[in-house]
C-alpha cells in the first residue's frame, strides 16, 4: 500500500495535468440559416484549451461534413476563433457536421501530433 505522504504529490500532479489539459470547442454557427443563392454558408467555432504544452501556432481547424474537410482560417482579431464558408448543394436542407482540430504539443523529446473532434451539430437551411 502507498504511504499517504508519498502518494499525495502523485495525486496532485495527476489532478494538475487533467486540469491543464481541458479543451472546450464551442460552436458559433447558428442552427438555422436562410438559403443562400450562392450555396456558401458561414461556419465559425471557438477553441479554448488550458493544455500548457500546446503549440498554439500549430493549430489547424476544419469543418467536417461527411468525408469532406473544409479548412478554416483564424479570425484576424481573436486568435481562438476560426471561420470558413462551406458549400451546400441546393437540394440539401440539413447539414450534419463537426469540427476537427489538428495540433502539436511539446513532448519530452520533441513535438507530438494530436487531434480533437467536436460533437456532431446540425445546420437547418430554411427556404425563403
Residue locations for each model-derived region?
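Glycan-association/targeting regions that enable binding to alpha-glucans and other polysaccharides
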Residues: 20-128
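Sec-dependent bacterial lipoprotein signal peptides
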Residues: 1-21
Amino acid at each position: 500500500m502507498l504511504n499517504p505522504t508519498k502518494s499525495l504529490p502523485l495525486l496532485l500532479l495527476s489532478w494538475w495535468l487533467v486540469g491543464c489539459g481541458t479543451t472546450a470547442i464551442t460552436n458559433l454557427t447558428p442552427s438555422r440559416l436562410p438559403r443562400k443563392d450562392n450555396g456558401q454558408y458561414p461556419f465559425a467555432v471557438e477553441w479554448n484549451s488550458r493544455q500548457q504544452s500546446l503549440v498554439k501556432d500549430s493549430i489547424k481547424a476544419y469543418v467536417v461534413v461527411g468525408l469532406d474537410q473544409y479548412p478554416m482560417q483564424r479570425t484576424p482579431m481573436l486568435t481562438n476563433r476560426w471561420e470558413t464558408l462551406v458549400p451546400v448543394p441546393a437540394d440539401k436542407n440539413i447539414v450534419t457536421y463537426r469540427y476537427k482540430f489538428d495540433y502539436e504539443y511539446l513532448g519530452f523529446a520533441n513535438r507530438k501530433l494530436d487531434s480533437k473532434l467536436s460533437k456532431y451539430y446540425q445546420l437547418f437551411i430554411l427556404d425563403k
